[in-house]
């Protein structure tokens, strides 16, 4: 009996510390990219397309949009589309997916690919959902430099900061 208890104790000691421990690099990236305060002066994605000549821009957008997957599960990259109008944003009981005005606006809205890079210019190798705790439908403010590709009608934003406005 004593041997069984000793064996069980050893087994529990061995597996007790096997939980997932987040790499310290993730915290460093969060500290680098997560904006504590909601920045002022955001523009729409449509406006950002005309200002995407290499200058830093600040957009308010909704995570998700376009066809296909919103997130890349290998790197910190995701799609965003136009955020709901400010008068609709955060209204109790408002469902942008069921609102005819929001649906009409979003139907033809451009999509943006947002990516986060390391200091040496490589894509951060962590799913943005894990790194930043975001999900489809969140409204975010993204700060970064953009480039617009006319052939794909896609704005690509190399993000330097992000603030989650609403979940």
Spans of model-derived segments:
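Sec-dependent bacterial lipoprotein signal peptides
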Residues: 1-18
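OB-fold and OB-like single-stranded nucleic-acid-recognition modules
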Residues: 18-167
């Amino acid at each position: 009996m004593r041997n069984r208890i000793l064996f069980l104790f050893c087994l529990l000691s061995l597996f007790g510390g096997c939980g997932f421990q987040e790499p310290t690099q993730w915290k460093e990236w969060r500290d680098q990219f997560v904006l504590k305060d909601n920045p002022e002066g955001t523009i729409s994605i449509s406006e950002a397309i005309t200002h995407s000549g290499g200058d830093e821009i600040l957009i308010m957008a909704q995570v998700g949009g376009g066809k296909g997957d919103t997130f890349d599960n290998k790197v910190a990259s995701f799609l965003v589309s136009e955020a709901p109008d400010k008068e609709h944003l955060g209204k109790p009981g408002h469902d942008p997916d069921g609102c005819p005005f929001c649906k009409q606006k979003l139907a033809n809205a451009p999509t943006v690919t947002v990516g986060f890079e390391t200091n040496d210019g490589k894509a951060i190798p962590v799913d943005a959902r894990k790194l930043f705790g975001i999900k489809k439908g969140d409204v975010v403010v993204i700060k970064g430099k953009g480039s617009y590709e006319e052939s794909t009608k896609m704005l690509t934003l190399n993000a330097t900061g992000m603030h989650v406005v609403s979940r």
